[in-house]
Structure formats: structure tokens, C-alpha cells
A protein has these predicted regions:
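Non-transmembrane, aqueous-exposed alpha-helical and coiled segments at domain scale
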Residues: 1-234
Length: 234
């Protein structure tokens, strides 16, 4: 069926779940799932050849901060003191960061660009959609991890072993914060309706990972999305 649709010239969308860093081959083993949540699984799972699937767009989905379920390295985790834990609680509540089935609170951290660079490289992102930008509104401080310190050396992507990753210390860049905004109004007004500091945040991320922003989630509803590039457009 998929081969016929492709040969007829139809567009086909494959949607993955979970995340790069719990990929059984490319994640931080043994803190992984049993499958491949990376883009290569689209070919294996669908039966379409890699040259067919690889000829299209690959849009990475990322939150404006970091969350994780379960164990494993998380260098930017907000758990160092009472203030960090309070901030993590605030982000967790605003972002609904609880397990869908178990209700277990997810671990929260600042956006980790080394992790995002690794994800972009492994899956070959042509663009990213950044969600939960509204959740970071109203913070007193805003940080992004741009690299790690490991054994006296600064690196810009995740190391090759989990043991080395566990020893990494984050290198942070502090960015301007933005005030809360009306999600529906921003979705209607488009990208320029976002607060200036939010746009600067997104552009900083895009520059750091050398990947353009395709869409921005500014609220919890599907309609509260700002589209910059539609991969289905010719």
C-alpha cells in the first residue's frame, strides 16, 4: 500500500515516539527502550527503502526545556538545591510533565544542546519544531546548556559512553527571559507576535544546532502552533 501511494506521488508522514537518547543503538545504554525511536526506524518499520524515506524531510520535535522519565545521565537536571527543585516543580506543573500511565513526575532540566546536536546528527534533521515555549514564560532566569566539561576538555556533543556522559558538567549560556503571553493571540499573529526574547531564544537554538525552526508550540492546544515552514509545501 505504501509503495503504491509513494509511486502515485502522494506525500507520506511517519511519526515516531519517545526520544533519541533512549534509542537502543544510539541512546545512553542501558537506560534505553527496546526499539529505535530515531528516524531510521521509519524505513525499517514501514518497509519502504532507505533511499525512499531518506529523500524526504526529517523534522525533530523538541521541548524548549528537557524532561526525562527514568534513570540515566541528565547533566542539566534541576535538582541541585531547593531553588532548582522549586523551579523544576513549577515547569513540571505548567508543562504537565507527568507519566501518561503512571502519573510519575518526569525529571526536568534546562535545554541540552549537546543532546540535541546528537539527535540532529543521528536522524538527519532538516528542521525542528520547538514546543512548550509558553512554559518557560515568566522565569527569573533562563539557561541553555551549550556544551560539557569532561576531563578538562570542553565538548559540544554527548560522549561515546554512558560512563563518560555521567561525568560531564554542563556549560551554560544565560539568555533573556520573557513574560507570559496569550497563546491564542500569538498563534494567530504568527512568529513576530512572540516576545522578542522568546524569538532570540529560538534563533539561538537554531544557530547552535545549525538547523532551522519549522514550527513553535506556544500553548497546549493543537491550534496554538506557529508554523514557519511546512515540509509538505513544494
Amino acid at each position: 500500500y505504501l509503495h503504491r501511494r509513494h509511486e502515485a506521488g502522494d506525500e507520506i508522514l511517519f511519526e515516531g515516539a519517545q526520544g533519541t537518547h533512549i534509542d537502543i543503538d544510539h541512546g545512553n545504554y542501558p537506560f534505553v527502550t527496546s526499539s529505535n525511536p530515531t528516524a531510521g526506524a521509519a524505513s525499517v518499520g514501514s518497509g519502504l527503502g532507505v533511499t525512499t524515506v531518506g529523500d524526504g524531510e526529517v523534522v525533530g520535535i523538541v521541548k524548549a526545556y528537557l524532561s526525562r522519565v527514568g534513570e540515566g545521565p541528565l547533566p542539566t537536571e534541576l535538582d541541585g538545591d531547593a531553588d532548582e527543585e522549586a523551579l523544576a516543580d513549577d515547569i513540571r506543573e505548567k508543562g504537565g510533565e507527568f507519566g501518561t500511565v503512571t502519573g510519575r513526575p518526569r525529571r526536568i532540566g534546562w535545554l541540552d544542546l549537546p543532546m540535541l546536536r546528537h539527535a540532529a546528527r543521528v536522524s538527519g534533521f532538516t528542521g525542528v519544531a520547538v514546543n512548550h515555549v509558553d512554559v518557560l514564560a515568566g522565569l527569573d532566569d533562563l539557561k541553555v546548556c551549550t556544551g560539557y566539561q569532561l576531563d578538562g576538555e570542553e565538548i559540544d556533543t554527548v560522549p561515546t559512553t554512558t560512563e563518560r556522559w555521567e561525568r560531564c558538567e554542563p556549560v551554560f549560556e544565560t539568555l533573556d527571559t520573557w513574560e507570559s503571553f496569550d497563546s491564542a493571540a500569538v498563534a494567530e499573529g504568527g512568529y513576530d507576535a512572540l516576545p522578542e526574547a522568546a524569538r532570540e531564544y529560538l534563533e539561538f537554538v537554531a544557530d547552535e544546532i545549525d538547523t532551522p525552526i519549522y514550527a513553535v508550540g506556544v500553548g497546549p492546544d493543537r491550534e496554538e502552533t506557529v508554523e514557519l515552514t511546512n515540509p509538505f509545501d513544494e
